[in-house]
């Protein structure tokens, strides 16, 4: 083909892809194509069941999703899906999906999830799977959820605990950690302000955040990652797969869900600002939860380039538990990439699978 004609055709293809990406995004979204069954609904939660075509292990794998996100990250592409990977590795997979929370849910807090929804749903999974034990996986905020749930309920159901990108020592989390540490110092200078912020006196409607605000905040926490994704799109407009993947990830990032005010109280004003998990103990309502109560097999992961929760912030969990079987590993990518990137799928998923296979009952 003549070089000029070839260049023109390539430019035409780029314009076509760009036009589709801007004006017809929905038709390009590849996520959540894997079939599943909803086995139970409870309050603000649904339990998805992804049956393994060849179940090899007694204990099912339960993914607990963080709040604010939709479930696309667990089944992102037909050819790169976390749930499909583990299904085809011989595990029945369950995904705890939080429903679309809104302003009416502003009073929900950590205890609503770790002492109500999670116990109910894990019991339901155990009944459905006919297994006393599960392998439990939590990423980001869900890492806090599964850690605190396990600490409260060990050794009831959790045989293997996997915690990824979870802020245990929040002040050690790079620039973000230093920012929260500095704010806490300022707050501590005024007892009235400190009491107002930290004792739950702020009306929940004032600290409830919308999905749109959460989406903006997520991008602002890692602006370089967002800019790199836009750059990659513009440099690869002629590549069909790149454009479809960009549309899929864009849909995930742009369609976030509300954070209830009670959750922001516990996550931002407690976990991040006061950094109690570093000590291994956190007070939630009338419950004192101690991480030393975790005695099961523990797998801790951190993104090698995570700007939100650094490895230094995630790693201390192992030393705060009573587990005699602790594995820590760095995962390729940032806070989002550690769950979804091609490198993660190639390098980390097989490692996590092998770790789980060795600790599961055939």
Language-model features: where?
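Alpha/beta-hydrolase-fold enzymes
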Residues: 2-3, 127, 131, 147-259
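Short, surface-exposed "cap/lid" segments of acyl-processing enzymes
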Residues: 34, 38-102
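Alpha/beta-hydrolase active-site loop
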Residues: 108-126
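Gly/Ala-rich beta-loop-alpha elbow adjacent to hydrolase catalytic centers
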Residues: 137-146
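Short alpha-helix in the alpha/beta-hydrolase fold that links the catalytic acid
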Residues: 284, 296, 310-319
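Short beta-strand/loop motif that positions the catalytic acidic residue
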Residues: 294, 300-302, 306
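Catalytic histidine-centered segment of alpha/beta-hydrolase-like enzymes
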Residues: 308, 333-347
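Catalytic histidine neighborhood in serine/cysteine hydrolases
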Residues: 314, 320-336
């Amino acid at each position: 083909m003549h070089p000029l004609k070839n260049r023109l055709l390539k430019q035409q293809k780029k314009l076509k892809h760009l036009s589709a990406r801007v004006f017809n995004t929905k038709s390009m979204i590849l996520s959540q194509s894997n079939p599943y069954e909803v086995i139970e609904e409870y309050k603000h939660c649904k339990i998805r069941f992804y049956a393994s075509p060849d179940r090899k292990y007694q204990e099912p794998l339960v993914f607990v999703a963080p709040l604010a996100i939709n479930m696309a990250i667990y089944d992102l592409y037909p050819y790169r899906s976390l749930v499909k990977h583990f299904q085809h590795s011989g595990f029945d997979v369950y995904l705890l999906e939080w429903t679309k929370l809104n302003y009416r849910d502003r009073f929900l807090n950590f205890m609503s999830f770790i002492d109500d929804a999670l116990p109910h749903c894990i019991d339901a999974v155990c009944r459905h799977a006919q297994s006393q034990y599960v392998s439990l996986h939590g990423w980001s905020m869900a890492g806090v959820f599964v850690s605190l749930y396990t600490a409260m309920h060990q050794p009831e159901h959790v045989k293997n605990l996997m915690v990824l990108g979870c802020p245990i020592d929040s002040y050690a989390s790079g620039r973000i950690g230093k920012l929260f540490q500095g704010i806490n110092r300022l707050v501590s200078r005024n007892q009235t302000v400190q009491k107002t912020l930290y004792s739950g006196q702020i009306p929940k409607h004032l600290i409830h955040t919308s999905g749109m605000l959460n989406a903006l905040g997520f991008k602002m926490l890692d602006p370089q990652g967002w800019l790199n994704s836009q750059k990659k799109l513009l440099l690869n407009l002629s590549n069909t797969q790149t454009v479809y993947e960009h549309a899929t990830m864009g849909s995930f990032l742009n369609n976030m869900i509300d954070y209830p005010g009670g959750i922001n109280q516990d996550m931002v004003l407690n976990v991040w600002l006061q950094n109690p998990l570093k000590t291994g103990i956190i007070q939630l309502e009338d419950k004192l939860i101690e991480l030393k109560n975790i005695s099961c097999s523990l797998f801790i992961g951190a993104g090698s380039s995570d700007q939100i929760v650094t490895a230094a912030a995630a790693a201390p969990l192992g030393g705060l538990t009573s587990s005699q079987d602790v594995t820590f590993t760095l995962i390729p990518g940032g806070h989002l990439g550690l769950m979804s990137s091609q490198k993660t799928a190639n390098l980390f998923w097989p490692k996590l699978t092998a770790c789980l296979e060795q600790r599961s009952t055939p």
